[in-house]
């Protein structure tokens, strides 16, 4: 299983669109793809036809788990109408995660451990990241094998790219 994060510390640069497009291309090639929506705005969740206010489970629930096994993680994954593509949806409660979780030990590795529990079920995981550095972004980057940084050729998007590269450098050192 290969894990990609689609990340930039700037909103509106095409992270969600890139995630869906890449997932679609991979599934057309016969790969099993899990998408993870880590943004409280839940654009990916909505794009895939779910109402983030009424989903039966969300990424927030994953952060409440005490153990990460296939049996505990798989129920949080929803099937999409698109063949070969599933999602762990977002919910607005993700916006409170930094405050709720505090400084718990191992906070940055929760998503990585959860994805390892379902690694036999998917060929690729695509993580649609929020535009801010916080618990969700750190978890996404720590879980990733590769990072795709969409950027537009305009000043603020380039500043977002600079911040993203600084963040990656800091994480790589720690």
Predicted features by range, described:
Residues 1-174:
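P-loop NTP-binding core
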């Amino acid at each position: 299983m290969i894990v990609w994060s689609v990340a930039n510390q700037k909103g509106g640069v095409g992270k969600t669109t890139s995630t869906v497009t890449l997932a679609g291309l991979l599934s057309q090639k016969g790969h099993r793809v899990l998408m993870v929506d880590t943004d409280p705005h839940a654009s990916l969740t909505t794009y895939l036809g779910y109402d983030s206010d009424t989903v039966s489970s969300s990424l927030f629930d994953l952060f409440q788990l005490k153990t990460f096994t296939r049996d505990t993680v798989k129920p949080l994954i929803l099937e999409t109408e698109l063949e070969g593509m599933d999602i762990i949806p977002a919910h607005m409660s993700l916006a409170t995660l930094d405050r709720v979780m505090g400084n718990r030990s191992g906070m940055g590795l929760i998503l990585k451990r959860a994805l390892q529990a379902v690694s036999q079920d998917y060929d690729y995981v695509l993580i649609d990241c929020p535009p801010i550095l916080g618990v969700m972004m750190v978890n996404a980057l720590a879980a990733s094998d590769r990072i795709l940084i969409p950027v537009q050729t305009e000043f603020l998007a380039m500043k977002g790219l600079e911040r993203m590269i600084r963040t990656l450098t800091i994480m790589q050192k720690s």
